[in-house]
Amino acid sequence: MSSMTRGRCDPKNGVPTDLVKEYYTQRAGAAFILTESISWTQRGNGFPGSGSLYNSDQAVGWKKVVESIHAKGGKIFI
């Protein structure tokens, strides 16, 4: 599954919401999932609702998404 930004992460902090986890988990049967755009720095965030991965809260949020996909046998790349 190719990447497509959904804008469903928390717009204040970039942490994936339960809706993000549900969205990707529903697609876990795809051969391979490439996530939406992810900012690696606070300054690099292009727009509200996009995902981020530059602090521990965000890492914990993405870990929940990844574990949910792996539980369904899926593969994901952030």
Question: For the regions a protein language model found, what residue spans apply to each?
Answer:
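Flavin-dependent oxidoreductase catalytic cores
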Residues: 2-77
